[in-house]
Amino acid sequence: MTQDNALLQAPELTLRDGSNSRKVFIKTYGCQMNVYDSTRMSDALARDGYEPTEDMEEADLVLLNTCHIREKAAEKVYSALGRLRDMKKKKAADGREMMIGVAGCVAQAEGEEILRRAPAVDVVIGPQTYHRLPEALRRAKEGQRVVDTDYAIEDKFEHLPIAESRKIRARGVTAFLTVQEGCDKFCTFCVVPYTRGSEVSRPVAQIVEEAEKLVEGGVREITLLGQNVNAWHGAGPRGEAWSLGDLLYRLAEIPGLARLRYTTSHPRDMDDRLIDAHRDLRALMPYLHLPVQSGSDRILKAMNRRHTAAEYLSLIARIRTVRPDIALSGDFITGFPGETDADFEDTLRLVEEVRYAQAFSFKYSTRPGTPGAELKDQVPEQIKAERLERLQALLLKQQQEFAESCIGKEIDLLLEKPGRMPEQLIGRSPWLQSVNVDAKASQIGDIIKVRITGTGNNSLFAERAEAAV
């Protein structure tokens, strides 16, 4: 799951207890799913009287919702915990209590080690057990130091409240909705199967209920989330087997839900029904994040991706046949163990053929406990960096070319937030680009017709073309 998409970066979520004046600050690291998880933890804590603060200094509870994907992720968390230890000590000297919690994938991976290395931490809770966070905090209040990272037998989502409409409305007109968690693919570079567990799909009724609540709260665009979201499966109303495509058709029936997206996908799980949904559903935006990681069959095999470059390109061609205006995004890793110059050139050729509107690329870094960490022929850091620089230059060129190709097009723009200038609003294009427009007499949540007039560093500019819808 990509971690650097501008649309999907979350604010730092916070909470406060009106009766007891308890406040909580949640710092979110990493992917979109952590953003969603922070929101759900926020809602769960609200039942115990916590409400938001944007000032860590005044928080009674500081919660780090962590990510374990990047290199040295755990060390960065320990560094942050060192600063929090000092803050906790200072507050204690002033007669004020502050609790510290660590959640997310570093919590899952490190467990008891966090309490050993960071004694100031009160609670460590994993991504599959955060519905038990309020109980863990109660135990910590009684003097226990709590580690709860065992995979829950119960469905955590059944125990998590859905926010009231007023809170949903305050969060904006776009929302995330997790429908699937975990991964069974076991790519040799990836820690997700070890930190998030095996693939689990939420039931249809549960997903539809949450989506309807979001729409009632003013949400107009929902992004379905999963570590491998297109592996989602469930039972339809007559007990028939459903895939993600079927779920999208059902969600598109919800009145008031104007837009749907989903991320992140695996090429092996792009079935016919999902491709049909891209053809048929006006609400499903023409944007697809479909990681490939490498253009070399040899490296793809070493990564355990279970597809070839040709199969990936064939899939892209099928999708573009049914949805010619679709914008493609991807993930790439340079310097995977054993990658030669020829392998890297294969990756560049694949990028040239696909022509991405956006992509994310990283140097390979060993993740302890993954098969990739045990492979020989590790690529020198300098070569990894040189290849990454070449790849990113090509991807940036393609991104700029895609943005320039939008000039002159009329598009539907969902208005999301105020701009920097008076009467300016910022929205998202169907292709996930940030668009600035003078939208006098329009409101956040409107979908208006605009004409793209220019490009900026990371955004587009537009003029009004029609009235709001």
Swiss-Prot record:
MF GO annotations: 4 iron, 4 sulfur cluster binding; metal ion binding; N6-isopentenyladenosine methylthiotransferase activity
Enzyme Commission code(s) on record: 2.8.4.3
Domain of life of the organism encoding this protein: Bacteria
InterPro entries the record matches: Elp3/MiaA/NifB-like_rSAM, Methylthiotransferase, Methylthiotransferase_CS, Methylthiotransferase_N, Methylthiotransferase_N_sf, MiaB_methiolase, rSAM, rSAM_horseshoe
Main location as per UniProt: cytoplasm
Cofactor: [4Fe-4S] cluster
Note accompanying the cofactor annotation: Binds 2 [4Fe-4S] clusters. One cluster is coordinated with 3 cysteines and an exchangeable S-adenosyl-L-methionine.
CDD domains: Radical_SAM (cd01335)
Positions of the Radical SAM core domain: 169-401
Record carries keyword S-adenosyl-L-methionine: yes
Keywords: 4Fe-4S, Cytoplasm, Iron, Iron-sulfur, Metal-binding, S-adenosyl-L-methionine, Transferase, tRNA processing
Keyword field contains Metal-binding: yes
Enzyme's top EC category: transferase
Function in brief: Catalyzes the methylthiolation of N6-(dimethylallyl)adenosine (i(6)A), leading to the formation of 2-methylthio-N6-(dimethylallyl)adenosine (ms(2)i(6)A) at position 37 in tRNAs that read codons beginning with uridine.
Record's subunit section: Monomer.
UniProt record similarity statement: Belongs to the methylthiotransferase family. MiaB subfamily.
Name listed for the protein in its UniProt record: tRNA-2-methylthio-N(6)-dimethylallyladenosine synthase
The species this protein was found in: Rhizobium leguminosarum bv. trifolii (strain WSM2304)
Lineage: Bacteria, Pseudomonadati, Pseudomonadota, Alphaproteobacteria, Hyphomicrobiales
Protein encoded by which gene: miaB
